[in-house]
Design a protein with these regions (language model features):
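Non-heme Fe(II) oxygenase metal-center motifs and adjacent flexible, charged/small-residue loops
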Residues: 1-181
Length: 181
């Protein structure tokens, strides 16, 4: 008897170094986090609203310097930072956080996060709605689309961090298996 016969591989299994944790935070934690985020100042420098904590990333220069220090990471983010340290490959508390707001129809071009700017593990927490993110590896000409359920967290390290671009297509709705989500 094969116990694994009915277990289908998940799309993220195709990408070494990508870990997806569904329901990383509770609905209550999400609600409190959104309320705190919405009470902070948003920047409108890009086609989307953004908040920077710790250090401000310079999108034009693709860099961060000590001059871009914008203060400490707020207390409302501390519980998530501490969980990252306990439950992931992070070896120290994050010192930089970027909050991106993507409205329907907005997205972000496919990219690899700036290598000298950010450390070996990147984490992303999805809030408010499900979203499809596309991963592309130009070295092997492969594309993998993954559903990020709201309140899920994904980590990129190793091959996923350095060889796979990730982006969100600018579309009003996402489809999974022909169904609009």
């Amino acid at each position: 008897m094969n116990l694994f016969a009915e277990i289908e591989p998940k799309p993220q299994d195709a990408i070494s170094g990508l870990t997806l944790i569904e329901s990383f935070i509770s609905e209550d934690e999400e609600s409190k986090l959104i309320k705190n985020i919405d009470n902070q100042l948003w920047l409108n420098d890009l086609k989307r609203r953004v908040q920077h904590y710790g250090y401000k990333y310079d999108y034009k220069a693709r860099g961060i310097t000590e001059d871009f220090k914008v203060g400490d990471i707020p207390q409302f983010i501390t519980p998530i930072s501490e969980r990252l340290l306990r439950e992931s490959s992070f070896t120290k508390l994050p010192d930089q956080v970027i909050v991106n707001e993507y409205l329907p129809g907005q997205g972000i071009s496919s990219h690899i996060d700036c290598v000298p700017c950010f450390e070996e593990t990147i984490a992303s927490l999805s809030l408010c709605s499900d979203c499809v993110i596309d991963f592309t590896n130009p070295y092997i000409n492969q594309k993998v689309s993954i559903l990020l359920p709201k309140r899920s967290l994904f980590f990129l390290k190793g091959e996923a961090r350095y060889n796979w671009q990730h982006g969100i297509a600018s579309r009003k709705t996402d489809k999974i298996d022909g169904q609009i989500i």
